[in-house]
């Protein structure tokens, strides 16, 4: 598994689809996660964002999903995923979570997550 696959696997471990932010299929249905991918760097911290998207009258499900992600990252103060020749190291950014509404559709809810990732080389 390479770095990109490790990050993709992390975001797809939350029981909803996840896509790199510029590759969401036209027929994708909410809820889903979009995320940035900076896989060119090694041994450098990168500040990235991910977005959780839901369509609902309530914020409960989307906030619950954000808290699930937070728990996975912060269980040990970080999350580590092994990939070929290294490790993906994820920590929470600050602020970790921001809620946003969509002015075009009041049912669309968005939570922006700030994270820090670092690809640590093992050779």
Which residues does each predicted region cover?
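Charged, amphipathic alpha-helical segments and their flanking helix caps
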Residues: 1-22, 26-27, 34-123
